[in-house]
A protein has these predicted regions:
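Short connector loops at helix/strand junctions that flank enzyme active sites
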Residues: 33, 40-42, 66-69, 90
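Vicinal oxygen chelate
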Residues: 85-137
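Core segments of cupin and vicinal oxygen chelate
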Residues: 9-52
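A short local loop/turn or secondary-structure capping micro-motif enriched for an aromatic residue
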Residues: 46-47, 53-57, 131-134
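Helix-adjacent hinge/juxtasegments
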Residues: 60-75
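Short, conserved charged micro-motifs
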Residues: 15-16, 79-84
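N-terminal beta-strand motif that seeds the catalytic metal site of vicinal oxygen chelate
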Residues: 1-14, 71-72, 76, 127-137
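Short glycine-enriched loop/turn motifs at secondary-structure junctions
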Residues: 1-2, 65-69, 106-107
């Protein structure tokens, strides 16, 4: 697997450590007083303190589900997805899109959920029932 790098802004490092480190369980990497790296499910996430990018007032539709734009996230294994759902629900997470299955019974069937980090950045986590169908139409 090739590691993907994503960098964006957050409002502060304390709440960012709490969300990504404690809540999501991501291992912290290097940091300074203005940025922090996390192992985000095998990928490098670099979070920098600054003005947070505002979400669009216009959402997009995917399989008749309205999804926030922009958003980022990770494709994880089916079982890991449902373990994460249980963990987030036990912590009282408010979902933008509740955990659900899209494209059910069709190629690319996927479990998905959307929620915000503590800076208001929209995240999507999803899992494909058949991972080999990630790019299948």
């Amino acid at each position: 697997m090739k590691i993907f790098h994503l960098a964006f802004t957050v409002k502060d490092l304390d709440s960012t450590r709490q969300f990504y480190g404690e809540l999501l369980g991501c291992q912290e990497g290097r940091s300074t007083d203005t940025w922090i790296d996390f192992n985000f499910f095998g990928h490098q996430l670099s979070l920098h303190v600054g003005e947070v990018i505002q979400r669009s007032k216009t959402n997009s539709k995917v399989d008749d589900i309205s999804v926030p734009m922009p958003h980022y996230g990770c494709v994880i294994e089916w079982g890991v997805f449902y373990d994460l759902v249980a963990k987030l629900q036990s912590k009282g997470m408010t979902f933008i899109v509740d955990p659900c299955v899209r494209f059910e019974g069709r190629p690319g069937e996927q479990a998905t959920m959307f929620f915000e980090d503590y800076s208001g950045n929209a995240l999507e986590f999803k899992a494909y029932r058949n991972p080999e169908e990630v790019f299948t139409s």
